[in-house]
From Swiss-Prot:
The gene is tag-76. Residues 16-32 have a biased composition (Low complexity). This is Putative protein tag-76. SMART domains: DUF1785 (SM01163), Piwi (SM00950). GO terms for cellular component: cytoplasm; cytoplasmic ribonucleoprotein granule; nucleus; P granule; RISC complex. The lineage of its organism: Eukaryota, Metazoa, Ecdysozoa, Nematoda, Chromadorea. It comes from the Eukaryota. Residues 660-966 form the Piwi domain. Residues 379-486 form the PAZ domain. Residues 333-356 have a biased composition (Gly residues).
Amino acid sequence: MSRRNATSFVDNNTLTSSGISGSGSMSPPITSRPASGQASPLTSNGSLSPPQYADDQGSVSYNLDSPRDLSPLLLSELACLNMREVVARPGLGTIGRQIPVKSNFFAMDLKNPKMVVIQYHVEIHHPGCRKLDKDEMRIIFWKAVSDHPNIFHNKFALAYDGAHQLYTVARLEFPDDQGSVRLDCEASLPKDNRDRTRCAISIQNVGPVLLEMQRTRTNNLDERVLTPIQILDIICRQSLTCPLLKNSANFYTWKSSCYRIPTAAGQALDLEGGKEMWTGFFSSAHIASNYRPLLNIDVAHTAFYKTRITVLQFMCDVLNERTSKPNRNNPRGPGGPGGPGGYRGGRGGGRGGSYGNFGNRGPPGANVRDDFGGNGLTFTMDTLSRDTQLSSFETRIFGDAIRGMKIRAAHRPNAIRVYKVNSLQLPADKLMFQGIDEEGRQVVCSVADYFSEKYGPLKYPKLPCLHVGPPTRNIFLPMEHCLIDSPQKYNKKMSEKQTSAIIKAAAVDATQREDRIKQLAAQASFGTDPFLKEFGVAVSSQMIQTTARVIQPPPIMFGGNNRSVNPVVFPKDGSWTMDNQTLYMPATCRSYSMIALVDPRDQTSLQTFCQSLTMKATAMGMNFPRWPDLVKYGRSKEDVCTLFTEIADEYRVTNTVCDCIIVVLQSKNSDIYMTVKEQSDIVHGIMSQCVLMKNVSRPTPATCANIVLKLNMKMGGINSRIVADKITNKYLVDQPTMVVGIDVTHPTQAEMRMNMPSVAAIVANVDLLPQSYGANVKVQKKCRESVVYLLDAIRERIITFYRHTKQKPARIIVYRDGVSEGQFSEVLREEIQSIRTACLAIAEDFRPPITYIVVQKRHHARIFCKYQNDMVGKAKNVPPGTTVDTGIVSPEGFDFYLCSHYGVQGTSRPARYHVLLDECKFTADEIQSITYGMCHTYGRCTRSVSIPTPVYYADLVATRARCHVKRKLGLADNNDCDTNSRSSTLASLLNVRTGSGKGKKSYAPSVDDESYSLSDATSDQILQDCVSVATDFKSRMYFI
């Protein structure tokens, strides 16, 4: 199926140079000029990738090759930058159609506006050395309250946060009028190996606190006083967290959400695999306009482990979910059994236990399933027998699932003890340990024999034991004597099916969500809450109402090659159509190849797909080859690496260029997908596009159009642009503007134990529209929010902008994602200084004004239309462009809510924007219009998106880079790592320097300091190399 002869489609051999067209270089692909009648907005000759231009700005000289040394005067100026002042709101926005809306905030009224509460510091002392969780500290505290009525006269006049803070309506009377007291109590804690534990509580008087909301008023980010609103937050949660109230036993509190514990079947959504979805409500106190306290209430959904089930039932649920069908697509294959002493077996094999071989198959005829993950059997409690044992594959699956969970040991009557599971071990009849008999002699016996003597014979002696408790102690329990501790939140990664089930259950239309929130507020019974009553706090039963404005969307311009249609289209309900339109600036694909990870007998479908794709690309104005030059078949991720190398070598031999490799996947497989992207982005520097076989077999025009949109952008083209209005023309067109998107992704708790770093992505436009973007990626120490190496990235982005447009940016607009309000001061101070330093490092007089905007997506504010006529779509959401800057916004600073997308499913979540720095002096209308316009430039679809495009792209880049790092660290999607391998993963190389200094515990696999010692610089460089894409890719949109 080469362009010369379609019958050569299945030929895997190297084609001759005559069968591949190209210029013979590996330079970026050629991009065509704009459609006829349109001048190029980038350069005079229409090129998207101009050469390195000489400076034509007159007196300004740019140091583009190396950073310049800053003078002492400039360094002093940078040190004195004031990044602490809050940007004042420049006024309220006025443009747009006004509509009345409601939001899920409820007014809070204080009986005494200047009420004073007494603050105390609480320390809880436990005789053991373990750390207490908040649930345990609440049990101990409230038990002390019950045991000492002479100190706590009114238990409802207390507000305890579950840690170290206590607030009271009146001063507590301590003996001898002391400022502190130590109280003893006996509490029943499930994790202790006794019925009751004697604990002590130290309470120290800190002083009075004035509950006046305007105490938070300050123009300095570092001086904001949050205590009053935090106290109201604690007070509102007391009824559901105080164990002295019977109703609290029906709820479980996790951070700011309270979930109702299911008490009967059907009250929770079954997610399979021993998990279920609980429903609860989120609540958080805020200070809004005019310093009015509001309570934000929202519906909350999350996954928990099933309640009241045994570990055996949990095992059945997990294995039935993961091994219900023969695992023929398992990329690891069956592998071998686990090796002794905890080392892995063959590739894909089970992991051995700490004391021997997991993979023992047992005698012939034993009730054991094959290593491929199942033979059609289903695990149930009825099918388990004395001879039941697990295969090495099943052992690995269940071991990964139960590791880290809390279980209850129930082998002792009337004594329930809670343990944390470290790992699975050998079956009970084979796991041996040393003990002392009644006569004081040392004996060696199996766990099965020990339990048989002490508590009766085991029903399932061939099932693995659980290693629980401190990792250094040998505490082993048979699974049949264990229960799943509940309530217990599920914190691991869920499968796509489970995630989809939660989204489907939670995605209700706006009117239904509004009703649910009202029901939750009513069920909370704030009107009869004894704690609120004692503190003099009242919560309204009605949602806050305010006025919103619906901003008009910008028109969208396509190419003008098709004169029969108007190239300008107008979005309606957040979307627009490309019918009969051509790309605004189509790119040229000179040649491409294909890797098909499907059956070679599907050749006909692949041929049809290639024809359909070429026809659609041509119709959209893109020059695209009729057939791929090379087509190669494979099955596994190892084949992907081999085939990428073969294709690159063949083009290199023929001195031609491959602009893109299309990879056809049989089904979604993240491991194979990331192998493709690693080979594409880092190893070979050839653009790639993955397509699922189900889309290849049915290449509809819409499917082909979506693929063309991605390919065009990856090869340097522009799909469409917004038509500049007065505001956009002033700030984005008349003067060159660089729009930057920054996002930082952090590792999960499981990934942190494997030394997974944080990943920062910096994206900025390389044209004047802005539509085309380049990206930089930086890795840094885990969980640090501010971007450490931002200076280098911004400097490179400015230089790239200049070389592509021949103009320096006259202003810089930064959209920053993922920053909480408590981090505003730190991030703003460090990142603005880095951006300013990057500008001065290029030229001393290069000082473009900077506007820095934080974009927040993870909040619980929702906006509902008051009248049905204003609702849009089946989900009855607010219309795209809905903007709110009154009523529910902050009383200080410059923030607003903007719902820029059309909610197809569920209730739309508006994005919240905080303008932390505005040297460009935007008005409210200007910044809101520009932000809304930037939500219409996302190239992968013909819809407006929920956040500005630069931030969206930064998130894509960070996600891609994070996957590259995980692959190098040997982490799979479930965050499992081969901790016994010392040379196969980067984690072992980084163990010495990452997280092990200054008394911190290192969680990486242990290595010998002398043989593996690396400097911090070397560690950082290794991590950076993991995400360093090909040089040409840094100014191209490879991440689309």
